[in-house]
Regions:
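PLP-dependent amino-acid enzyme catalytic core
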Residues: 1-205
Length: 205
């Protein structure tokens, strides 16, 4: 069986253009939601940063599945041809990416097989399975990546990386574009952006 790695979102130094980001935004359409941006109202934080500083939150917890991860999974999967999509996808995750693969596979009419470390949150594992994900639990992340490569080779599934690749960066950049668009309306100007980082996929965008 042909290995599907050529179809995956391979790491690249290419920086997504604004045109590409906007095209990705249009392509995803209503498969993801434009999450709200709201001012942070907290007296303790206001005292810490000073009264003249306004803090805004981009609330990705209101994204479908509860995290920003579907943005990347859907962008990669929408680029698959019909045969690759029919074979399904695979991935490594401790939770949010696995859930996003399940969500994406369901709405695109395919299947997902995910390898997760045994330390993954039990509730997240349950949510994955409720989405129809075939979950395999292993001892650690290194073993998970090795196992998922075996699945990719044996079944022809496309490996969707949890945070690397130009397509993933491009779709995550949509989050930043939404953020800027939201702040233009009240006439705010950004001095700094603080981004929580795990694998770095959101930060890359």
């Amino acid at each position: 069986m042909t290995n599907s790695s050529a179809a995956t979102d391979q790491p690249s130094l290419d920086v997504p253009t604004l045109e590409a980001i906007r095209a990705t935004r249009k392509r995803l359409g209503e498969l993801v939601v434009t999450t709200p941006t709201r001012p942070l109202m907290d007296d303790a934080i206001a005292n810490a940063v000073g009264a003249s500083t306004r803090l805004w939150l981009k609330e990705e917890l209101f994204q479908r599945t509860g995290s920003f991860k579907p943005r990347g999974a859907l962008t990669v999967m929408l680029d698959l041809d019909a045969a690759a999509l029919a074979r399904g996808v695979t991935g490594v995750s401790a939770g949010n990416h696995a859930i996003s693969l399940g969500y994406s596979a369901r709405i695109l009419g395919t299947t997902a097989k995910v390898v997760m470390p045994k330390t993954a949150n039990a509730f997240r594992v349950q949510v994955c399975r409720e989405y129809g994900v075939d979950v395999t639990l292993v001892d650690n992340v290194a073993e998970a990546f090795a196992r998922v490569r075996d699945i990719e080779a044996a079944e022809g599934r496309t490996f969707v990386h949890p945070y690397e690749g130009p397509k993933t960066a491009c779709c995550k950049a949509r989050t930043g574009l939404e953020f800027i668009d939201h702040l233009r309306a009240p006439g705010e100007e950004l001095d700094a952006v603080i981004v929580a980082a795990g694998g770095g996929g959101l930060t890359a965008g």
